[in-house]
From Swiss-Prot:
SUPFAM superfamilies: Cytokine (SSF50353)
Subunit details: Interacts with FGFR1, FGFR2, FGFR3 and FGFR4. Affinity between fibroblast growth factors (FGFs) and their receptors is increased by heparan sulfate glycosaminoglycans that function as coreceptors.
Residues spanning the signal sequence: 1-30
Compartments where located: Secreted
Cellular component, GO annotation: cytoplasm; extracellular region; extracellular space
General function of this protein: Plays an important role in the regulation of embryonic development, cell proliferation, and cell differentiation. Required for normal limb and cardiac valve development during embryogenesis. May play a role in embryonic molar tooth bud development via inducing the expression of MSX1, MSX2 and MSX1-mediated expression of SDC1 in dental mesenchyme cells.
A GO biological process held by the record: mesenchymal cell proliferation
Organism, as annotated: Homo sapiens (Human)
Official protein name in the record: Fibroblast growth factor 4
Membrane-crossing segments per the record: none
A GO molecular-function annotation: fibroblast growth factor receptor binding
């Protein structure tokens, strides 16, 4: 039995034709396309190709279910991606960064490696992707942060808004473990910190 999601997918071609119809017959002019030279467009293409490759490597049981994708609950590719720097106000203040060698750390200044793309995986859960390094921020079962070249379930974090308007990022796979930076800008093990500690508080900045 087909549901609302199936009907919406079936109507998509008709909607696209209706949107393109006003451009037909104008001296053969092609329909306008979105600019391909923007940073956002390039990141979108790279990110989607990475995730598609990563999902292909996952076991079938770990891949998003068709029903979840149709309902929008698991289709994070359709969500809003945010380019941000995650600032932790400890020590002299540090931005979380994903380095080209796969390490995760902190940098006081705005660096190319501290520009991150936060993408929704499902409601309240995000992935954190290093724009320059092309590594996902991931956390192991021992609470160690590392850079993953592919998207896995260790790359998912629950984004929690705190009373001070900072965010805490809790491992979705390993609840109770949080992303944290020390006063020296080094990563701290996620199983040795809590959201009451300042080292886990991050402010998303442009």
């Amino acid at each position: 039995m087909s549901g609302p999601g199936t009907a919406a997918v079936a109507l998509l071609p008709a909607v696209l034709l209706a949107l393109l119809a006003p451009w037909a017959g104008r001296g053969g002019a092609a329909a306008p396309t979105a600019p391909n030279g923007t940073l956002e467009a390039e990141l979108e293409r790279r990110w989607e190709s990475l995730v598609a490759l990563s999902l292909a490597r996952l076991p079938v049981a770990a891949q998003p279910k068709e029903a979840a994708v149709q309902s929008g609950a698991g289709d994070y590719l359709l969500g809003i991606k945010r380019l941000r720097r995650l600032y932790c106000n400890v020590g002299i203040g540090f931005h979380l960064q994903a380095l080209p060698d796969g390490r995760i750390g902190g940098a006081h200044a705005d660096t190319r490696d501290s520009l991150l793309e936060l993408s929704p995986v499902e409601r309240g859960v995000v992935s954190i992707f290093g724009v320059a390094s092309r590594f996902f921020v991931a956390m192991s079962s021992k609470g160690k942060l590392y850079g993953s070249p592919f998207f896995t379930d260790e790359c998912t974090f629950k984004e929690i808004l705190l009373p001070n308007n900072y965010n805490a990022y809790e491992s979705y796979k390993y609840p109770g473990m949080f992303i944290a930076l020390s006063k020296n800008g080094k990563t701290k093990k996620g199983n040795r910190v809590s959201p009451t500690m300042k080292v886990t508080h991050f402010l998303p900045r442009l």
